[in-house]
Amino acid sequence: MFKGIVEGIGIIEKIDIYTDLDKYAIRFPENMLNGIKKESSIMFNGCFLTVTSVNSNIVWFDIFEKEARKLDTFREYKVGDRVNLGTFPKFGAASGGHILSARISCVASIIEIIENEDYQQMWIQIPENFTEFLIDKDYIAVDGISLTIDTIKNNQFFISLPLKIAQNTNMKWRKKGDKVNVELSNKINANQCW
């Protein structure tokens, strides 16, 4: 379980594509390197991954399952992209946010971004077959960020992220049309990334 709070922003340094797996090299921020080692559990844009190796500040992950690559946003990533990172909370630590399984329910599309002095707001559209799982004022996670659904319209939902928080996540670089990972408040989890 993860906290739904972004602890740092990683940068994709390298992607190696193979027949049965993809290998991702992520440059980690200095504040997250302490304690990161092989087999550490990491939240990567809302998806649970296991570290395969660490070389200085470069952390490697393997994405094995073809279905995982098909269902989440891994197929969208390119070198230079920024990703949200989080770690498994230590026993007894305050969680904040809401507890996430880091199992992606579906991939959604950003259809509108509205920014003002205090908030970054978005309309996000999920696949129609997940509409029934949207609950007004319920928790939802977008790329691993714990949020509350403000409004629902058909298969779209509206969220407001305080600007000071948005500036410390990959949402700072998001634009209309981008794909994001969504976890639907533990009501349904269709996929797990390893």
UniProtKB/Swiss-Prot annotation:
<dbReference type="InterPro" id="IPR026017">
    <property type="entry name" value="Lumazine-bd_dom"/>
</dbReference>
<dbReference type="InterPro" id="IPR023366">
    <property type="entry name" value="ATP_synth_asu-like_sf"/>
</dbReference>
<comment type="function">
    <text>Antenna protein that modulates the color of the bioluminescence emission of the luciferase. In the presence of YFP and only at temperatures below 20 degrees Celsius, luciferase exhibits a bimodal emission spectrum with a new peak at 545 nM (yellow), in addition to the one at 485 nM.</text>
</comment>
<dbReference type="InterPro" id="IPR017938">
    <property type="entry name" value="Riboflavin_synthase-like_b-brl"/>
</dbReference>
<protein>
    <recommendedName>
        <fullName>Yellow fluorescent protein</fullName>
    </recommendedName>
</protein>
<keyword id="KW-0285">Flavoprotein</keyword>
<dbReference type="GO" id="GO:0008218">
    <property type="term" value="P:bioluminescence"/>
</dbReference>
<keyword id="KW-0677">Repeat</keyword>
<dbReference type="InterPro" id="IPR001783">
    <property type="entry name" value="Lumazine-bd"/>
</dbReference>
<feature type="binding site">
    <location>
        <begin position="179"/>
        <end position="183"/>
    </location>
    <ligand>
        <name>FMN</name>
    </ligand>
</feature>
<comment type="subunit">
    <text>Homodimer.</text>
</comment>
<keyword id="KW-0288">FMN</keyword>
<keyword id="KW-0455">Luminescence</keyword>
<dbReference type="GO" id="GO:0009231">
    <property type="term" value="P:riboflavin biosynthetic process"/>
</dbReference>
<feature type="repeat" description="Lumazine-binding 1">
    <location>
        <begin position="1"/>
        <end position="98"/>
    </location>
</feature>
<dbReference type="Pfam" id="PF00677">
    <property type="entry name" value="Lum_binding"/>
</dbReference>
<dbReference type="GO" id="GO:0004746">
    <property type="term" value="F:riboflavin synthase activity"/>
</dbReference>
<feature type="repeat" description="Lumazine-binding 2">
    <location>
        <begin position="99"/>
        <end position="194"/>
    </location>
</feature>
